[in-house]
């Protein structure tokens, strides 16, 4: 398997874009291999510019829950493009997608469409602060909520630490309005509220953490957050940009039966086009302009192409789709555990529906500290060998893999076989 064309393309890209990419992970630095440039996808497969075929478990980092080039999505996108790409005014497509989202997401009575997950989270934080009249936000170590200043915060030591900037360019004053605590740790949350409860506008959480690998909530964690925020009059915010419509038909909140005050969405609801959304109770959402005084706007918010792609994607998902995801997920999870044990490779497999994370350590992995104990050198070796076997995985130990309705049992069998061959090679060097 060669990457000659990708290598040449990357050399040119480096002269034009910082690091040669428009999102850092695409540089493949953490796995020490050339950045792969993709050409096209179909079903569960993706093809690079050198002509290599891969079973795709990245799926554009989650949005393509129906796989690549879904016929219904593509057909209706063509029809939408023929009408025009953007109008700067409302369209019927916005209503169709909004109705579907409100019907399926338990917490959402009204929804505002935006153009990215980062927009959704930053606007939700502003809304929470404006609605409560409080400034502080609680987030969790290892949870990523986009790249807005108030959420790019590094966790400090101790139980509840006022944030320090995790990136140059984030003012320390902004960071101090964010409290970071360990994921899955209710004692830390209680301590944070004992210290700052009257100033906390809300708690934002990934109901299944997906940016330290896949880390599901321990039993009682989400309900505990619901109870504590209710006690202190703070808002509970679920960042379901990744988990929305992926963990379950009614999102993670339906799957775990814990209902937040506000929900952030993205990825799947755009079917591969740029999109985000946030929604919640009417009384909170009606604080947003033009009804209320909390300002939010966007040139391309609710654009007809993303609305069409999102509607045509969600309309094809049924409860049976998630039964299929669980069938494939069980198969892949069991297979990974067996081949890892066969070759004495330390591996912990976490899964929530069609999100699967594998950590090269002995586990368990329930928080960011435990995820960080993974063998990154071994992961890098594994990644390169899996690419040679025609399996496209996220080029980072701290990202999850995804399934689609286009994946087949044959894909899963081939993937398990590829892991078997890979572990055979890297453990016998």
Curated annotation (Swiss-Prot):
It comes from the Bacteria. It is an enzyme of class 5 (isomerase). It catalyses: (S)-4-amino-5-oxopentanoate = 5-aminolevulinate. The keyword Cytoplasm applies. Pathway: Porphyrin-containing compound metabolism; protoporphyrin-IX biosynthesis; 5-aminolevulinate from L-glutamyl-tRNA(Glu): step 2/2. The modification N6-(pyridoxal phosphate)lysine is found at residue 267. It is found in: Cytoplasm. Its main location: cytoplasm. Keywords: Cytoplasm, Isomerase, Porphyrin biosynthesis, Pyridoxal phosphate. GO terms for biological process: protoporphyrinogen IX biosynthetic process. One of its GO terms (molecular function) is pyridoxal phosphate binding. This is Glutamate-1-semialdehyde 2,1-aminomutase 1. It comes from Staphylococcus carnosus (strain TM300). The gene is hemL1.
